């Protein structure tokens, strides 16, 4: 209990905060974060912790606590990080078209008439890239009209902003319109942390997590640890923000950031642009981080002003200068610290098949020969949510102009994807689009396109067994991700390096040191690229048809239609609640090696089934490699009959045989797609037992009523085989104790010959997650509460 003096302190500061900031109305499109409310919460935290120094991430998280005094009870903050579950109130939700379908189908089951927080839908994942916007956009709209109509009707019914096809990529639009210093938001996409480039805490989640925020249900997050990255020096020449994160990925690996928020600090931060910081935060997903963020800078202020949000910058100035809200306290403690000298960074090339295989450009040529990677580069692609800012494009076009002046054009197919209609229109006004097209580049629609596998590639077939090399400025490069071909090697790097490589077409080419032979026999060498942080003439609005109603009101008269015969959309049937007994399953599959969400629930051609759980479940784990046979997408019934993996899952579901999958480290790495949890649940999966999980996927499994367990002893992975019976021994007791049983589950393994043994497994279930499990899913649980209100 606070003393009367402390209660007076908080009350007095509440009045101060309220008077310093513009009032935040219930207008769902308010751009200014609720600073007065956040600072009042922070005051309470400061009192409880005896004014302990806080990191920026802690300030933003704790200021969004539903009940600060209940959540933070100790001045020792080290007992919270990595241990305590926080109940949070996010400020907004953003959803892309592929994941929004399932999120909204789940939201519909709650019976609410509007969302509890501002929300937006962005149609970017379902647009195919092939011939350019003029042809690709109408074709993609026609193909996906049913889905777009469904999403738009949901938006109208519930008062959600609807950014239609062609408007841009979700993360670029969020940065341009919604992200703000100190904001906390959720997004149904793993690269939602892109918004951290503007000082927000933005976290990628599955649709069921988004429904928490949409329904006003406190959203739960295990308090992350804080990884501090100290930046010194200044980027120069060819080095870019992309190289900061590709280098960091090499240092930390794809799971080195799991359980952490990455917070950047140091004098080097002030030398970066806002969009450069967004690039760095975007690919924090590739190291497994919960999210990434930057302290408020002058670059943020410039970007806010350039995107018509001067009032946000003014309020942020007050929050920083009067209350020190938007930066870490002086003596804030990080759980780990990594230092990177920006002045010493050289361009990096990451890949193939994993975003953490990082190679400095000076070593790439030699390494590519040693590894026998294809030396001919077959395509160059720039853009994506990671690198489609005006600054990126202006630096790239500087290289294009240099080459054009020398009489050179790209020697391989070269694709450009603008991040938004605002970016595209500004590039068009400034003549940059014309320069790209005059020099052989194909400018695609404002959408994800090839980055998410929506690439109708003609020069290489999906079934080609020959390896080929592409260079992209994307963020992820798993097998078959971009063009459906498992033998395409995607090397991730900056858009500047991609562009230069497109003029050479040779993996041995290093644009920092090498020249290209001209037809006249002379040598041409690129000079380091130059560009503008922001357009000198300001941003161009672009075509009105690509902008939504900015302040939509919910309309309960709008009918949301789902055709029962549709193969694209399907209303959800609730999963059955837990029966109160121990789980007894058979091991269906033992997975070997990397198993990302692309392996578990592939995108590409499967994106069209995102709103139809039954149909998309036919792709479950089709990319997984069977540890026992080395085969991909092969599993064997108890009698030895061969099936594809989802085929066996369906058979066992029909037989009434629940199943378990065994896997290795970082299971579920990659995107936020909850279908990777929904489909196994739909097909009868009850347990996932792995060496370690990626954060988002583990949460998604819990939300859908699947029990995620990790080996207490990793060597036990080697003791289990497909066909074994796996049953829990103390699940009932664990649930009776609301998960507080020491975090262990005893698991009995019985071999086909009757031999049995017991192993220890670990769980991370909170009380709320236990309630989800008992109800059958989080949506069942929320629905039960709503019906009883």
Curated annotation (Swiss-Prot):
Keywords: 4Fe-4S, Amino-acid biosynthesis, Iron, Iron-sulfur, Lyase, Lysine biosynthesis, Metal-binding, Mitochondrion, Transit peptide
Record PROSITE patterns: ACONITASE_1, ACONITASE_2
Keyword Mitochondrion: yes
Protein's pathway: Amino-acid biosynthesis; L-lysine biosynthesis via AAA pathway; L-alpha-aminoadipate from 2-oxoglutarate: step 2/5
Cystines in this chain: none
UniProt: [4Fe-4S] cluster binding residues: 385, 448, 451
Result when mutating residue 610 to R: Reduces catalytic activity towards homoaconitate by 45% and increases the activity towards aconitate by a factor 116
GO cellular component, one term: mitochondrion
Superkingdom of origin: Eukaryota
EC number(s) per entry: 4.2.1.-
Disruption phenotype: Has very little effect on growth on nonfermentable carbon sources.
Catalytic activity: (2R)-homocitrate = cis-homoaconitate + H2O
One Pfam family it belongs to: Aconitase_C
Requisite cofactors: [4Fe-4S] cluster
Residue stretch of the organelle transit peptide: 1-14
Transmembrane segments: none
Molecular-function annotations in GO: 4 iron, 4 sulfur cluster binding; aconitate hydratase activity; metal ion binding
Signals that turn on the gene: Constitutively expressed with a small induction when both glutamate and lysine are missing.
Residues that hold substrate according to the record: 96, 189-191, 476, 481, 610, 672-673
Family recorded in the similarity comment: Belongs to the aconitase/IPM isomerase family.
Function: Catalyzes the reversible dehydration of (R)-homocitrate to cis-homoaconitate, a step in the alpha-aminoadipate pathway for lysine biosynthesis.
Something else known: The fermenting yeast S.cerevisiae has 2 aconitases, ACO1 essential for the citric acid cycle, and ACO2 specifically and exclusively contributing to lysine biosynthesis. In contrast, in respiring filamentous fungi the ACO2 homologs (acoB) seem enzymatically inactive and the ACO1 homolog (acoA) is solely responsible for these functions. Present with 4670 molecules/cell in log phase SD medium.
Name of this chain's protein: Homocitrate dehydratase, mitochondrial
Organism: Saccharomyces cerevisiae (strain ATCC 204508 / S288c)
Gene this chain is encoded by: ACO2
């Amino acid at each position: 209990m606070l003393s009367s003096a402390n209660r007076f302190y908080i009350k007095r500061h509440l009045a101060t905060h309220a008077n310093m900031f513009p009032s935040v109305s219930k207008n769902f499109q308010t751009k200014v974060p609720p600073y007065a409310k956040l600072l009042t919460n922070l005051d309470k935290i400061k009192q409880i912790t005896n004014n302990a120094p806080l990191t920026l991430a802690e300030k933003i998280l704790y200021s969004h606590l539903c009940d600060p005094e209940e959540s933070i009870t100790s001045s020792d903050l080290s007992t919270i990080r990595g241990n305590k579950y926080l109940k949070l109130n996010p400020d907004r939700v953003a959803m892309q078209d592929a994941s929004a379908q399932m999120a909204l189908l789940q939201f519909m089951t709650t019976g609410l008439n509007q969302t509890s927080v501002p929300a937006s839908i962005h149609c970017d994942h379902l647009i195919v890239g092939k011939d350019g916007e003029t042809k690709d956009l109408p074709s993609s709209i026609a193909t996906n009209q049913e889905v777009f109509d469904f999403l738009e009707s949901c938006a109208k019914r519930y008062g959600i902003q609807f950014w239609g096809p062609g408007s841009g990529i979700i993360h670029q639009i969020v940065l341009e319109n919604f992200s703000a210093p100190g904001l906390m938001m959720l997004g149904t996409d793993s690269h939602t942390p892109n918004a951290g480039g503007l000082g927000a805490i933005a976290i990628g989640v599955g649709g069921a997590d988004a429904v928490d925020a949409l329904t006003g249900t406190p959203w739960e997050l295990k308090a992350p640890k804080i990884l501090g990255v100290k930046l010194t020096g200044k980027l120069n020449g060819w080095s870019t923000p992309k190289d900061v994160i590709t280098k960091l990925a090499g240092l930390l690996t794809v799971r080195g950031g799991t359980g952490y928020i990455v917070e950047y600090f140091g004098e080097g931060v002030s030398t970066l642009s806002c969009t450069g910081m967004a690039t760095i935060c975007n690919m924090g997903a590739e190291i497994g981080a919960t999210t990434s963020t930057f302290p408020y800078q002058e670059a943020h202020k410039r970007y806010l002003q350039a995107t018509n949000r001067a009032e946000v910058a003014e309020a942020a100035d007050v929050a920083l200068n009067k209350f020190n809200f938007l930066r870490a306290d002086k003596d804030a403690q990080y759980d780990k610290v990594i230092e990177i000298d920006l002045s010493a960074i050289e361009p990096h090339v990451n890949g193939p098949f994993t975003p953490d295989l990082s190679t400095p450009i000076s070593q790439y040529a030699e390494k590519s020969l040693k590894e026998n990677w294809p030396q001919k580069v077959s395509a160059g692609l720039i853009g994506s949510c990671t690198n489609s800012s005006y600054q990126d494009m202006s630096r790239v076009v500087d290289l294009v102009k240099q080459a054009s002046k020398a009489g050179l054009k790209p020697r391989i197919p070269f694709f450009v994807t603008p991040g938004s209609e605002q970016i595209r229109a500004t590039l068009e006004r400034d003549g940059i689009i014309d320069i790209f097209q005059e020099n052989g580049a194909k400018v695609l629609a404002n959408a994800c396109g090839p980055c998410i596998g929506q690439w109708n590639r003609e020069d290489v077939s999906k079934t080609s067994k020959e390896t080929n090399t592409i260079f992209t400025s994307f963020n992820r490069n798993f097998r078959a991700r971009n063009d459906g071909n498992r033998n395409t090697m995607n090397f991730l790097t900056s858009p500047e390096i991609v562009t230069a490589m497109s003029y050479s077409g040779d993996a041995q080419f290093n644009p920092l040191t090498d020249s290209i032979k001209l037809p006249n026999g002379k040598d041409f060498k690129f000079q380091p690229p130059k560009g503008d942080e922001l357009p000198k003439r300001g941003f161009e609005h672009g075509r009105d048809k690509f902008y939504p109603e900015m302040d939509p009101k919910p309309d309960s008269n709008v009918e949301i239609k789902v055709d029962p015969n549709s193969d694209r959309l399907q209303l959800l049937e609730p999963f059955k609640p837990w029966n109160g007994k121990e789980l007894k399953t058979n091991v269906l599959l033992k997975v070997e090696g990397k198993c990302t969400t692309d392996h578990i629930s592939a995108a590409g051609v499967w994106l069209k089934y995102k709103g139809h759980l039954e149909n998309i479940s036919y792709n479950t784990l089709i990319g997984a490699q069977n540890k026992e046979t080395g085969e991909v997408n092969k599993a064997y019934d108890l009698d030895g009959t061969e099936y594809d993996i989802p085929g066996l899952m369906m058979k066992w579901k029909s037989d009434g045989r629940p199943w378990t999958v065994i896997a290795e480290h970082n299971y579920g790495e990659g995107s936020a797609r909850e279908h990777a949890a929904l489909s196994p649940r739909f097909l009868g999966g009850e347990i996932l037992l792995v060496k370690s999980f990626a954060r988002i996927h583990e949460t998604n499994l819990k939300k859908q009523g699947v029990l995620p367990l990790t080996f207490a002893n990793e060597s036990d992975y080697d003791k289990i085989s497909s066909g074994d019976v796996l049953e829990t021994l103390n699940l009932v007791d664990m649930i009776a104790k609301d998960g507080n049983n020491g975090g262990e589950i005893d698991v009995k393994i019985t071999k086909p010959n009757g031999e049995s043994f017991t192993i220890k497994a670990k769980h991370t279930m909170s009380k709320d997650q236990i309630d989800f499990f008992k109800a059958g899913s989080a949506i069942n649980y929320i629905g039960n509460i709503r019906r009883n209100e």
